[in-house]
């Protein structure tokens, strides 16, 4: 029951009330989309100020103990002060949650799962999640937003949101991971998420900031309201083109996201062109086909014309070496279309040695 209370307290949100200060593919937590889900690419970057974040949270924890702030009806003392530690596992989860929450703006996930439905590090269990949105490019701004709840909490202001502050000062929380995601397409560019855990031994490695990246996010198909396909409309026989499928999550705005995996692709004529599960079209013979991609109840089609023949570019690989007793064999594979052919290398009929030179006891001799 204590966990349920802690989670209920922790699941609160905060957005800034003032004016704005300023306006590599990263994998998801699962290796393939869950049932009824797809992977999309969300553009953005991660900011890391992990050392400064831990330092600031511990300052807030120490202050609460020194000032006797109450937790669960009991005043904290300096004996209650326990420095919180960084968790590499929680940080990874917080980064995923920051990207998701930049779109949902709440404690909900685009894949329909619980915000605590992750593989957690060690033997512990999460106690709370806190979120913040702002216009900065700093991880510390979110922490200061959570800290701003202190006054209302100490005064006992009715109806005040204080779960972020109490998550930081609760001595039972021993580990934290914070993720800050900068998404220029979001309502607030900066989304900062943190998750807390109690006891357990965990890796404390801190991740670095990233440049502009494509973050892989799992999305429930029901969240997709429209899809559109783009790419080359023609391909030569034996060559390949990649079509791009983009999806709009209508409930969360008009931004379109590239679908990375989970869509169903098909061709209207597999003798003319084939298509892979990721939208790679291979021309097989002259003709026109319709390529269709389906995500849930949404689909998009694209007409592709296959023209000409492949101008083969072969790479050779010896599969059997020729000897004086038997023929050799070289496999030639076209780098464009994958066509294979074998070239026979006739067996060696004779061997002629040329003049050689060697040194023996410091003296050079010819043979």
Predicted features along the sequence, with ranges:
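Sec-dependent signal peptide cleavage junction
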Residues: 11-26
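Short, solvent-exposed loop/turn segments that connect beta-strands within catalytic domains
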Residues: 69, 138, 184-190, 252-257, ...
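Extracytoplasmic soluble-region selector
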Residues: 221-350, 357-367
């Amino acid at each position: 029951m204590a966990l349920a209370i802690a989670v209920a307290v922790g699941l609160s949100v905060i957005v800034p009330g003032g004016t704005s200060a300023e306006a590599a593919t990263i994998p998801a937590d699962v290796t393939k989309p869950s049932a009824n889900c797809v992977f999309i690419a969300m553009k953005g970057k991660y900011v890391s100020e992990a050392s400064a974040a831990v330092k600031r949270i511990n300052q807030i924890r120490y202050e609460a103990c020194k000032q006797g702030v109450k937790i669960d009806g009991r005043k904290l003392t300096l004996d209650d002060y326990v420095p919180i530690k960084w968790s590499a596992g929680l940080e990874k989860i917080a980064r995923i949650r920051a990207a998701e929450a930049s779109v949902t703006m709440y404690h909900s996930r685009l894949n329909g799962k619980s915000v605590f439905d992750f593989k957690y590090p060690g033997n512990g269990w999460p106690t709370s999640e806190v979120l913040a949105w702002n216009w900065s490019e700093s991880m510390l701004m979110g922490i200061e937003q959570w800290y701003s709840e202190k006054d209302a909490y100490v005064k006992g202001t009715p109806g005040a949101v204080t779960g972020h502050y109490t998550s930081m000062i609760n001595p039972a929380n021993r580990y934290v991971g914070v993720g800050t995601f900068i998404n220029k397409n979001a309502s607030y560019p900066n989304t900062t998420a943190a998750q807390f855990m109690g006891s357990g031994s965990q890796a404390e490695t801190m991740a670095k900031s990233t440049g502009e990246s494509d973050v892989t996010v799992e999305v429930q198909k029901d969240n997709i309201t429209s899809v559109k396909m783009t790419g080359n409309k023609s391909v030569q026989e034996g060559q390949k083109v990649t079509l791009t499928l983009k999806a709009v999550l209508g409930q969360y705005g008009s931004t379109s996201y590239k679908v990375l995996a989970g869509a169903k692709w098909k061709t209207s004529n597999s003798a003319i062109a084939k298509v892979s599960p990721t939208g790679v079209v291979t021309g097989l013979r002259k003709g026109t086909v319709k390529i269709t991609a389906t995500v849930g109840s949404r689909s998009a089609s694209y007409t592709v014309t296959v023209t000409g023949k492949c101008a083969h570019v072969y790479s050779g690989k010896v599969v059997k070496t020729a000897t004086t007793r038997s023929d050799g064999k070289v496999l030639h594979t076209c780098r464009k279309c994958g066509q294979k052919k074998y070239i026979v290398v006739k067996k060696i009929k004779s061997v002629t040695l040329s003049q050689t030179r060697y040194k023996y006891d410091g003296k050079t001799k010819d043979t």
